[in-house]
């Protein structure tokens, strides 16, 4: 006889894997910086400590993933496929706005089935660096945006610390500080920080390891 509270066959179902996360993107004159933490969890268990949540959509367009890991990656893969075809038809790289619209349309079409929030950011010859939020099928261009479970802890910081006209290095420092603060407070965010800087010259990838993260007074 089963005891009360004893595990049953049904209780061993695999929980959905989530990128309970902190993602961020910032525009600067000539490009963008996109960043994320690296923790992936299923329920209370951490299933991946170093997952890269910055997914390329095209050569100079990336998206930052949050929500269900499978759903977010599915949206990114569908968008990347459509943008590849779009680029072949136009015989030139797609615009960042076009990429954001593709992600927005997919997110809205499957809003009842998929649990994901993507930030789209990149560079093109027409508008330079651009950052778009696509939550729930909306589309908003912003000088910077944040997302994921950790974002609720850093709205005050990013509003106070952001200033127009920052250099690429200042944007990287701003992004690193914000994500570090979120990782300190949000149990679903953690690991390392991935940074991608996108300009006309190309894409620069960086990883900020745990012992390289900035230190704050509350630690």
From Swiss-Prot:
Self-association state and partner proteins as the record states:
The 26S proteasome consists of a 20S proteasome core and two 19S regulatory subunits. The 20S proteasome core is composed of 28 subunits that are arranged in four stacked rings, resulting in a barrel-shaped structure. The two end rings are each formed by seven alpha subunits, and the two central rings are each formed by seven beta subunits. The catalytic chamber with the active sites is on the inside of the barrel. Component of the immunoproteasome, where it displaces the equivalent housekeeping subunit PSMB6.
Listed GO molecular functions?
A: threonine-type endopeptidase activity
- Role this protein plays: The proteasome is a multicatalytic proteinase complex which is characterized by its ability to cleave peptides with Arg, Phe, Tyr, Leu, and Glu adjacent to the leaving group at neutral or slightly basic pH. The proteasome has an ATP-dependent proteolytic activity. This subunit is involved in antigen processing to generate class I binding peptides. Contributes to NFKBIA degradation and subsequently NFKB1 generation.
**What top-tier enzyme class does this entry carry?**
hydrolase
Please state what is observed when this gene is inactivated: Depletion of LMP2 by RNAi suppresses expression and activities of the matrix metalloproteinase MMP2 and MMP9 by blocking the transfer of active NF-kappa-B heterodimers into the nucleus.
Chain positions of site Cleavage: 20-21
Instruction: List the PANTHER family.
Output: METALLOPROTEASE TLDD, PROTEASOME SUBUNIT BETA
Record-given protein name: Proteasome subunit beta type-9
Q: Which domain of life is it from?
A: Eukaryota
Give the induction note.
Up-regulated by interferon gamma (at protein level). Up-regulated by IRF1. Up-regulated by heat shock treatment. Down-regulated by EGR1 in neuronal cells.
Q: What is its EC number?
A: 3.4.25.1
Task: Please list the residues that make up the propeptide.
Answer: 1-20
Q: Which residues carry this modification: N6-acetyllysine?
A: 53, 109
Taxonomy-wise, where does this protein's organism fall, top ranks first? Answer: Eukaryota, Metazoa, Chordata, Craniata, Vertebrata
| Documented effect of changing residue 177 to D | In LMP-2b and LMP-2q
Its family? Belongs to the peptidase T1B family.
Q: Which organism is it from?
A: Mus musculus
Keywords, in A-Z order: Acetylation, Cytoplasm, Hydrolase, Immunity, Nucleus, Protease, Proteasome, Threonine protease, Zymogen
**Where is it located?**
Cytoplasm; Nucleus
> What is catalysed by this protein?
Cleavage of peptide bonds with very broad specificity
After translation, how is this protein modified?
Autocleaved. The resulting N-terminal Thr residue of the mature subunit is responsible for the nucleophile proteolytic activity.
The record's tissue-specificity note reads: Detected in liver (at protein level). Expressed at high levels in the thymus, spleen, lung, heart and liver. Expressed at moderate levels in the kidney.
User: Where do the catalytic residues lie?
Assistant: 21 (nucleophile)
Q: Name one GO cellular component term.
A: cytosol
What gene is this protein a product of? Psmb9
Output the InterPro entries linked to this UniProt entry. Ntn_hydrolases_N, Pept_T1A_subB, Proteasome_bsu_CS, Proteasome_sua/b, Proteasome_suB-type
Q: Which GO terms describe its biological process?
A: antigen processing and presentation; proteolysis involved in protein catabolic process; response to bacterium
Entry keyword annotation includes Glycoprotein = no
